[in-house]
């Protein structure tokens, strides 16, 4: 499955229009500025990510949901003294599908709407990148006994770079969403309950090396695993650049799930990973 397959049209005066498949806008800067994005991140037996059951998650689910690539038409304004605005019409997501019934069908009467506003500026020799993003959609069902789900979310954050030091803080608040994937992977039957999270990170570059510290947490009232739970990831990573294309990585992280209503969800997983990141 191709994550990104799109075309763009635009110019410096009026901006750019993207049409095709790309990452969503809600949570976009949250994940793209994750210090562990090119590392390993968390794994979980509960989430089916151990022993080849899936890929490692970075900080997905512990600080932000994954802005899953989706078909869209998105407009991005030109940069206006550091300010840029993006707004998109996205393929909506089934959040009201009852897999226990053969007669119901989730449907949406309107597309999913997402937006992101970013602002870059310099203050006292420090480079700042700030953002706020959001989404809204509604999903209904042909079975009138299944309640309509109105989903909405807000993401935000700031990154400050001072020489070789980088500090990033981000977070999100949402209702009626899957706290792991914005496309509600697996099409779970969601409810209009809350989820929120934050991610705090710092990194320092010295020579060809970069060390990063990370702590992320998501509190979910039950849309993730069907029962309220808190999810946390603590991590430290060392990156060593061989050249512009190859980076060696060593990472240690700890992932925890704490069920609020039942201890059966409780999990603690520690992972040490080494590897290489190749880009071209």
What is each stretch, according to the model?
Residues 115-236:
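Detector for outer-membrane/organellar transmembrane beta-barrel domains
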Residues 1-3, 67-71, 109-113, 150-154, ...:
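Residues that define the transmembrane beta-barrel architecture of outer-membrane proteins
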Residues 22-24, 67, 88-92, 120, ...:
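Outer-membrane beta-barrel pore domains and translocons
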Residues 1-95, 109-111, 118-122, 160, ...:
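Outer membrane beta-barrel
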Residues 35-40, 104, 184-189, 230-231, ...:
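Flexible, surface-exposed loop regions and adjacent strand-edge segments
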Residues 240, 268-280:
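Outer-membrane beta-barrel "beta-signal"
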